[in-house]
Amino acid sequence: METKDLMYKRAYVWDKLNAEERKVCMDMGEDYKAFLNESKTERRCAAEIIRRAKEAGFVCICEKKELKAGDKVYYNNRGKAVMLSVIGSEPLENGMNIVGSHIDSPRLDIKQNPVYEAGGTTLLKTHYYGGVKKYQWVALPLALYGVIVKTNGEKVEIAVGDKCGDPVFYISDLLPHLAKDQMSKTMSEGVEGESLNILIGSLPVDDTEASDRFKTALLAVLNERYGITEEDFVSAELEAVPAGAARDVGFDRGLIVAHGHDDRVCSYASLAALLGIEKPERTTVGLYVDKEEVGSIGATGMHSQFFNNMVGEMIALMNGGVCSDISIRRALAHSTLLSADVAAAFDPNYPNVGDNANFAAIGQGIAMVKYTGSRGKSGANDAAAELVGKVRKLFNDHGVVYQTSELGKVDQGGGGTIAYIMANYDMDVIDAGVAMLSMHAPWEIVSKADVYMTSRAYHEFFVNYR
């Protein structure tokens, strides 16, 4: 072996692509932006995933009387989480190749009794969702999405702020001339959560003697447009997200800025990898789940039993309606999962928060993260060396550009994914996803080259991992 071959050197994806692959990479970037623009919330993302899956020949598992090799099925969990699967030729008890991502992102949720007026305006009270820097959400045009379930059970869809001609919404900030006290606070205290109130109106009713003139006028507008009353907010799920479409960044258009890259970029990469698979040996599964940003709790989060239930349903449909508990356990224990979540990338504006030899970089391919957690690996899923070796060999054998990463310097911070939850099923799990800048900001950055290479990595895992 030559001396130069002894050293491990990372590579840039762009350097490894030929002209045809570069075109495919840039075209995928355009498709990914279109995906993001239709997926501003977890509900809309789930709907877009299902729409694309149906176009590719997937059918709802609820419509199937039996399953056989090559069948393509999906499951819609309450409109907020999705499972896609292409049935393999091997028995499900032999295990599945699973890529698990999440489709929720940090945002501002609207409270259940949110409407009030003050200072000649009408506002909505919010409760932030996930790990946000609160100061990033002020002085920013916002769009409003969600559903309102009326007293009669009718569900009203809300989507305002992103179409041409739509109004936007806004959280005001304090002018610097009067911000002496605010500026003396820490960044986490400068904007309080209870101050993240969204401007939604400013016109009063004509009756100058009426009380709550501005609130009443706004409620009248909502009633005329959507047929709702104030009480209907009690049974509503509304989310404020940054207004605006995904855009290219840079003169060379190599990057994409958008809301929700975490973790819709890995969800998209997994979806693109899965839709073209026809007849795998091992059953392939794409998971697109909710509530990861707040602990993966609830019926649509990964802590729920919906995936176990779906594995049981698939086994039963493949075995004449028969499924035992041990069959489900074997199927899960013999599976391998790539926890498809984003990784923090080296930021040249903040170069001292990571150990750069063990920190991902933009444009260097899918980031494998052996362990997550914080401090002394608290809360981590720590993938076994044997698993890392198998995945590394898979990537090397199929020309996948990869890098390794962890979340910053020891004791600098930390975080987690769904990996540890899935490992509780006794399956092998490793984190592997797209490296990004400005994670959890209203607008985040990823590289088109990394989106392309991550999708290739997931495809090779789906089809060729054993």
Regions inferred by a protein language model and the residue ranges of each:
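N-terminal hydrophobic/helix-forming segments and targeting peptides
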Residues: M1-R466
